[in-house]
Curated annotation (Swiss-Prot):
Organism: Heloderma horridum horridum (Mexican beaded lizard)
Gene3D superfamilies in alphabetical order: Trypsin-like serine proteases
Tissue note: Expressed by the mandibular venom gland.
GO molecular function annotations of the record: serine-type endopeptidase activity; toxin activity
Protein's job: Has kallikrein-like activity, releases bradykinin from kininogen. Catalyzes the hydrolysis of various arginine ester substrates for trypsin and thrombin and degrades both angiotensin I and II by cleavage of the dipeptide Asp-Arg from the NH2-terminal end. Fibrinogen is also degraded but a fibrin clot is not produced. May have a potentiating effect on potent hemorrhagic toxins present in the venom.
Compartments it resides in: Secreted
Class of the enzyme per the UniProt entry, highest EC level: hydrolase
Entries under InterPro entries matching the protein: Peptidase_S1_PA, Peptidase_S1_PA_chymotrypsin, Peptidase_S1A, Serine_Proteases_S1, Trypsin_dom, TRYPSIN_HIS, TRYPSIN_SER
Protein name per Swiss-Prot or TrEMBL: Gilatoxin
One cellular component term from this protein's GO annotations in UniProt: extracellular space
Lineage of origin: Eukaryota, Metazoa, Chordata, Craniata, Vertebrata
Description of post-translational modifications: Extensively glycosylated, contains approximately 8 mol of monosaccharide per mol of toxin.
Length: 230
């Protein structure tokens, strides 16, 4: 996350940290005791290690809950997958992961509400994650960083992205003058509007946070029926 501050230690109980065996990370969001949602491009053929209740990933407190992925589902629901072919398309950059055992709800491990209505253009929303804070260099913080950005009309991203795939199932968000953005390592994390999971960090330009460059987020409300069918 660029241009933000360390998240409040108790202010992200739904935020999951996803680890691949080779070390790269994504974020995810706890939906209920058994499932998290993340970006499809975070797909990994092997087991993903999932930390919940994590704040400082280098200094664990002992009340974190660690699970591994038992099953991964990409959109559409028929893609309960063995290979990553159905998960690699950014057009529907959303993936559900079933945990190997249920989490216990605590002060630091709780789900985030799904959206009840679309976020309005101009709304201020919060994006968070453990991604790099120093583009074009890559420096990953020990703690999640939060920043507030603005919901923009998708046409803004279409102009900035010049024929990139801006569909009705994505959202455009950022700041006109740059300086605040999600970035490398934040993929799969939440864009939160009015206390609800409005978007999932999907993609954007690099270096991040450039003026007239914006982040693209999976529009969660477009996949609500699918998510609720698990």
């Amino acid at each position: 996350i660029i241009g933000g501050q360390e998240c409040d230690e108790t202010g992200h109980p739904w935020l999951a940290l996803l680890h691949r065996s080779e070390g790269s990370t994504c974020s995810g969001v706890l939906l209920n005791q058994d499932w998290i949602v993340t970006a499809a491009h975070c797909f990994y053929l092997g087991e993903l290690r999932i930390g919940l209740g994590v704040h400082n990933r280098r200094v664990l407190r002992g009340n974190e809950q660690v699970r591994v992925s038992a099953r991964k589902k990409c959109y559409p629901a028929t893609a309960s997958i063995i290979t990553n072919s159905s998960c690699s398309e950014y057009t529907d950059d959303i993936m559900l992961i079933k945990l190997d055992s249920s989490v216990e709800y605590t002060e630091r491990v709780r789900p985030l509400s799904l959206p009840t209505s679309p976020a309005s253009e101009g709304a201020e929303c919060t994006v968070m994650g453990w991604g790099t804070t120093t583009p074009p260099d890559v420096t990953y913080p020990a703690v999640p960083v939060c920043v507030r950005i603005e919901m923009l009309n998708n046409a803004v991203c279409e102009l900035a992205r010049d024929l990139w795939n801006i569909t009705d199932s994505v959202l455009c968000a950022g700041t006109w003058f740059g300086g605040k953005d999600s970035c490398k390592g934040d993929s799969g994390g939440p864009l939160i509007c009015r206390g609800q999971l409005t978007g999932i960090v999907s993609w954007g330009g690099f270096p991040c946070e450039q003026p007239l460059e914006y982040g693209v987020y999976t529009k969660v409300i477009s996949f609500l029926f699918w998510i609720q069918s698990i």
